[in-house]
Curated annotation (Swiss-Prot):
It is found in: Secreted. Disulfide bonds join C33-C187. The lineage of its organism: Eukaryota, Metazoa, Chordata, Craniata, Vertebrata. Belongs to the EPO/TPO family. GO terms for biological process: cell surface receptor signaling pathway via STAT; cellular hyperosmotic response; embryo implantation; erythrocyte maturation; erythropoietin-mediated signaling pathway; hemoglobin biosynthetic process; myeloid cell apoptotic process; negative regulation of calcium ion transport into cytosol. Residues 1-26 form the signal peptide. Keywords: Disulfide bond, Erythrocyte maturation, Glycoprotein, Hormone, Secreted, Signal. Glycans are attached at N50, N64, N109. PANTHER family: ERYTHROPOIETIN. It comes from the Eukaryota. GO terms for molecular function: cytokine activity; erythropoietin receptor binding; hormone activity; protein kinase activator activity. This is Erythropoietin. GO terms for cellular component: cell surface; extracellular space. The keyword Ribosomal protein does not apply.
Length: 192
């Protein structure tokens, strides 16, 4: 029940190009605009949050990890340009990715790593990579790199976490909040 040999190579090349964030013919360029796609990643993040809430005495980080503030001032968000929103989302994803990679290292160095935690950390890393590729296809990276000169980019508010529970709560909240708001606006703007 494997993939026929005639399809294996094109499929492999497509996955390789997607993982590098390059456009692929036949790949929907605005896949992130399908709400079901983002909801899948949000559901995975929420599952990780729920699992780690049950293990409050789980492994703590030996140092604090910096993560983005997930609070959204809706008035301020609406008045921001889509370029400013893109910058905030890219900065947040970058901080989350770095924190989750560091959490993966904590598990790797743990004397008794939890398989469940490892599974959710691996899913989060995979999810963040996929979301990054999907946002590139949407053009978010171009918006984040070249905000208009008139726009002053305000540094992203941050704070620190010291447990897996807090890390996954931030991850889940960021996807449900700022990322969802940004993609919704960017997709609507692209439909005009």
């Amino acid at each position: 029940m494997g993939v026929p040999d005639c399809l294996a190579l094109p499929l492999l090349v497509t996955f390789l190009l997607l993982s590098l964030g390059l456009p692929v013919l036949g790949a929907p360029p605005r896949l992130i605009c399908d709400s079901r796609v983002l909801e899948r990643y949000i559901l995975e993040a929420k599952e990780a949050e729920n699992i780690t809430m049950g293990c409050a005495e789980g492994p703590r980080f030996n140092e604090n990890f910096t993560v983005p503030d997930t609070k959204v001032n809706f008035y301020a968000w609406k008045t921001m340009g889509v370029e400013e929103q893109a910058v905030e989302v890219w900065q947040g994803l970058s901080l989350l990715f770095e924190a989750i990679l560091r959490a993966q290292a904590v598990l790797a160095n743990s004397s008794q790593p939890s398989e469940m935690l490892q599974l959710h950390v691996d899913k989060a890393i995979s999810g963040l990579r996929s979301l990054t590729s999907l946002l590139r296809a949407l053009g978010a990276q171009k918006e984040a790199i070249s905000p208009p000169d008139t726009t002053q980019v305000i540094p992203l508010r941050r704070f620190t976490v010291d447990t897996f529970c807090k890390l996954f709560r931030i991850y889940s909240n960021f996807l449900r909040g700022k990322l969802k708001l940004y993609t919704g606006e960017a997709c609507r703007r692209g439909d005009r």
